[in-house]
């Protein structure tokens, strides 16, 4: 997208959500939905539209795990890193994913199909270990189960 179109999207989102500090997170969330990540230019445009500092926008965007500030793969895998998931085998699940996708945590596959990230709590502690693939939760993971899940995404 070029800057003019991006700026129009920011204006449209500000019209929808408002131009107050409280509108910042909903606007950033919607930008991620539309563009899959927040560019530096997006954050500057939002700051101008809401009349707040770019540093405030950047600080907010980088604080929240789900507000990506760099391009990600088509499928973003977020593995929960809470103590509940860790105690239930998160490290084994992570190793399995890294082995299958041939990437390390924080990386994206060369074909840009998958990104592998950790997230703080994703809300499934009672069914740990858990992960999200984009917005789809997968729980009570085992190496076998995660292998099966990834095979389905690889086929897509």
Give a label for each model feature:
Residues 1-156:
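Signature of N-terminal electron-transfer/Fe-S-associated modules in redox systems
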């Amino acid at each position: 997208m070029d800057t003019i179109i991006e700026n129009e999207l920011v204006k449209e989102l500000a019209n929808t959500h408002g131009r107050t500090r409280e509108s910042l997170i909903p606007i950033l969330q919607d930008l991620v939905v539309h563009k899959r990540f927040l560019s530096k230019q997006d954050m500057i445009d939002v700051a101008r539209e809401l009349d707040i500092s770019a540093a405030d926008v950047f600080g907010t965007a980088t604080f929240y795990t789900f507000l990506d500030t760099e391009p990600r793969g088509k499928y973003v895998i977020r593995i929960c890193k809470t103590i509940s998931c860790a105690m239930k085998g998160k490290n084994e699940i992570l190793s399995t994913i890294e082995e299958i996708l041939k990437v390390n945590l924080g990386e994206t596959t060369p074909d840009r199909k998958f990104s592998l990230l950790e997230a703080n709590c994703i809300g499934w502690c009672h069914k740990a270990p858990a992960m999200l693939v984009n917005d789809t939760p997968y729980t009570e993971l085992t190496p076998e189960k995660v292998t099966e899940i990834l095979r389905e995404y690889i086929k897509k």
